[in-house]
Amino acid sequence: MSTVVNFQGKKCIEPGSYAAVVYNPTSVVNVAEFGNVMIIDTGLSLATVNGQQTEFAGGSGVKGELNQGLKSVYQFDNYEDFLAFMGGGLVGDIAYKIFTPRDGVAGAPKLFYVRAATTTAAKITLTLSEGNTLVFTCKNEGLAGNGIAVDGIVKVGYAAKVVAGDASGKFKVQIIKGTYKGADEYGEPYGAYSLAESTPDIITESEDLGTLAEAYEWAVNDKVVAANFNVSKKGADSTALKAIAQVLATGGTTVFLNDGEYADVLEAIEELDLTFFLCTNKNAASGAGVNAETNGKLFTYIKQDAKFSEHMFVPGGEDDTDLFGESNSSQSIAKYFNSDQVVVVHGAPVVNRKDGNGTKKLPTIYLAAAIMGMNAGMAAQTPLTFKQVGYQSFAYDLKRKEREKALQAGIMHVRNISGYWCVNQGVTTLQNNKQTIAPDGQSLELSISLIKAQINKELILEGQVRFTGNTAAQASPESVKNFTETKLASLVARPGEDNLLISWKNVGVTGRNGDYFITYDFVPNVPVNKTFFIGNMLDFTF
């Protein structure tokens, strides 16, 4: 039986390295990544096209037909690949700000995406005759695979048909994919073309074929087919092909948050190297920011179960009506979480319409994505304070008194500084903001919280490789102490080289049975928020 160690309020049972930071002052190659972002989709990808429900998403839900669990978590290191995977939609549009928070500024190094949903795969069934079929099962499961056509033209999802070949008596199989990327609440398309203008792509076409066996052999060996479908057949191999009119993919289903899917996501991602979560409530309306089934569960996870110290960005209110208040407001969200691992962002960007017909208001999640993406592209110790965001107009401009109250309430917001809209201060939702570092080690400053998290991650990742699974003779207290001191020294800032720490001291190691407990003191590389210049004016003399 494994011993249970209570470490900083967590029950540690499995072998491994664990780390925490407390505020209790006393008289190597860094391996951890920073800035990886995760989106747990709770229905943001759903849309309606031509009166039919669809979805702009790829892969399978966490409870999928073809994949489940961690295999349903998808990773991307650039926006183009993510957009191609999603096929458009609101999530695809928001993600641009995660990778490129503003023009010329790099954002998150990686984006992880998963649907907290149960999905079944859509299928295209080409029937040659009774009992003789060729079936394409969509790997993009759920509603996303279902074909939707307008006047016979595929707009989203998949379809296939069999057309006459070049030689007499031969036929070609064509696989078709819609290219429409959806539209926002104002009816403006996310992509370059409207629903009426969009035309489908023939993503692959076979050579001349004559029988079911030949069609199946082509399908299982075609790279495009393999990337998009599982292929099966029924019937006699010698069945002759024939022309078949366009057949839409059908039968794909997506059900979000129905049967423990959110918990399954959290279980699947436990070992992933993540820094930020972008919560998928659009704003503070209807209590979505504090939904116990989504954001509430995520908060419990990052506080109790996550391997690393991760952070949530929660979209808050949009204007003056939902800035303060006991419910459905940025203030109520901040009070609910009250943690330095949670950020609530207030403010709805206003942008020009693509058709040039005035402006439109975007939901707060766009600003949250932009700020989070900007933070993800910087070093952990770099504060968000006075960093320019990628928007230049907002639904409501906070007055000075409101900005001051918002900072005290733990609400991150923007402010116009010398003609540019910037983050006023990189604050967390921690309500105990009388001092920069609270007695429990939490901080009102996001950059300090991220410093803590990054130090912990560095120690965990390298510590478990060096020591876990060795014997006490191989991993002596002296070697553990030397490693910790070397690691901390590598994280100290020096002239011309910024880093996580200003200084460290007092590394101590104690052992009990097969467990080592390492303590150390450090001074984080804190942000500079205010500068006060006092001039001493002198009399003119000569």
Predicted regions and their residues:
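A generic structural signal for well-ordered alpha-helical surface patches
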Residues: 482-486, 518-520
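Compositionally biased, low-complexity/repeat regions
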Residues: 497-542
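A short beta-alpha structural unit
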Residues: 470-474
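Short, solvent-exposed mixed-charge patches
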Residues: 1-2, 542
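A glycine- and small-residue-enriched flexible loop/hinge signal that marks low-structured segments
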Residues: 2-469, 480, 487-492, 501
